[in-house]
Structures are given as C-alpha cells and as structure tokens.
Amino acid sequence: MTIRFPHLHAAIVQHPWAITPDRLQAIAEVVERRAEGIRLSASEIAALKGEREPNGVATLFSATTLDQVGVVGQQISVLGRGEGGSPAPVASVIAVISVFGIIAQHASEVDDISGPGGTSTERVMRSFRNALGDASVKAIVLRFNSPGGNVHGVQVLANEIFKARGQKPIIAQVDSLAASAAYWIASACDEIVVTPGGQVGSIGVYGLHRDVSKAAEAQGVKFTFVSAGKYKVEGNQYEPLTDEATQALQAQIDDYYRDFTTDVARGRGVKVSDVVGGFGEGRVEKDRVAVKLGMADRVATLDETLRRVASMKTSSGPRADHDTILHATADATEPDAPPSPPVDNPSGLQVSGNLLDASAPSATESDRDAFRRRRHAHRSRNG
C-alpha cells in the first residue's frame, strides 16, 4: 500500500462515482501501482479498464444493406461500395456510437497513457450532435458495454440525448452491460434494448475514503498539512474521516443520487418513487428481468436492432412523448398483444414492409396498449 501522491489518490477515490464498485477498485489499483513505481503492461491496463476500442466515435451502417460504410470529411458524409469496387454514395445510414469501458468527462485525454479503454462524454456528445444534425443519418444507436464511471459530464450528456427525442430514433443497445453512469445515459434514449444475457442497472452513487494514517505511522512517516480554509484538506487519506466530513460527503452523494433517479424516472416514464423504491436501489438485473421491471424495453442483439431500425420509416415532426415513440412497438415476447392492422404512428415512426426484415414488429394500436398495460402494472407494483 502506497502513501505517495495523496492528492492523486484522493482525486480518484473520493469524488462521487456512478460505477460498479469492482471497477473503481480497479482504477484505484492502477493508481496505487503507478505511485509505487510499478509499471503495468498494456494488456494489464486493458484488463482493468475494460474494452480497448475507439470509443465515443460513430460507426456508420447502410440503412439498406447494413454494411459498414466509410466516413468522408469531418461531417458524416459516407461512401459505400459501387460497381467494380468503386465508391458509391450512401443515402441513408444508421450511426452506432460506442460507449465502452469506464466513462469520464475527459477520458480521451488519457487514451495515449492507457489505451482507449474508456469513453469520454465529450466525445460521445460531439458524435451524437454530428449524427443528429446530418440528414443522411436516419437513426442513432448508442452501444453500451460499460460499468459506469465518474458522474461529471454524465447528466449533461443524458440531457442532450433526452432533448433530442422525436427528431430521429435514438436507441440504447446494451451489449452487454450498462451499469450506473452508463445506464444513466441509456435511460435518456427512446428505447433500451438488452442483448441476450446482458445486464442493466446499478443505479446509485458512492465515494470512497481510505484511511492510511496507521499504515503511515507504522512506516515512521508523519504528514502535516499547512492549509488555509477550514475544509481545504478535509477527507485526506492521512487522517480519519471526521463526522462532519462524512456528513458533507453523504450530502453530496445524495444530491447526485437525486439527479440520477430523477433523470431515470423521466427517461423511463415512471415516477421517481418507482425508481428509488424499486429498481433504483443499486442492483444489476439481467435481460428479461430488466424488461419485466421496466428498466428496459426488449431483448435483442445488435444485429436484430439494426435490422429493425433499418425497416423503420421516419419523418420529422414535433417531439413525441415517451409512450408514443419507439415504445410503440411492444416487446416481441408480450403474450397479450395479438396482431392487428397497422395504424398511423403519432410519433411519425412507421415500418416499411419491403425493407430487409419483413418480420420486424409493426407499430400497432394493440402494441401500444400492451406497452401501457406493462407500464401500469409496473406503477401499481411500486405504489
């Protein structure tokens, strides 16, 4: 255990995090080893941080063939494959933005140190805005495999996504984990789809204080802080945490938790009490259980989601409400939703039967009724 670089250690563990506890411990372990002069290999860092991918950047897929297409220029202008292998314009694409690994506001600034194992909310924001503003992008899919991360920047990104509802379909594809801060962001999307075996949740916020005062004393080391300002060095790791400091930290944690649960309730179309007293107590739930609890809308793979989205016909119009946007297509496993003739979708979202997947679910009145019944049942269970 190190007693070096106290401010670096404090910056990591004491600030509020919306992340699974094992991942925060992994981050702290990296800091500890670095402070002790132990260098980690790239593979070791990757294992601790999670995915090693260029995160927060949009990957584009043709909305007619689902082939991945290239990006030309700084805006989203795409070229596909023409005859003889020559470039051919692609009229409509689906933008898939990856949110992998640990989330931080400026994670891109440390990519050169530890590899692209995290996701920057700022980078996701830029990619999202570009995709939203480009007429060639018919839908946006945020693909999640993240344990969460630091709370900073998460609420801003979630608000940006939520405000964009109704402009074009925005889908969260959980492939295979959206925990804590990742779920905060996902809940702002029109729809949450969980891949089979995937997990969502871990709604909560926490901080960590590590008291190494006795360890330092055992090593014959004493630290004396010279500071101005009553609370300037409050919570440092070389002194036990006082009751006053604990209360201040708890108040901050509670405030972030209120923001978190309020945003989730808004995004999922339920009451805050449904979240706080129900699925928002910190547990992670698996695919179909999450759907049953109202944490997600359906279970499907990324490929299935892309095919379904490709078969949708979108039109511009005023922002739709939570019950009439993508949720208009009920979960495929819903037993009490008999098929009926398709009707106009008030959100402007329709299904075209001559594209890719003729079996894709259509937006029907009974589908909407089934979704509302599930939502009412969820509200009834949770008071």
Give the role of each language-model region.
Residues 1-383:
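N-terminal organellar transit peptides
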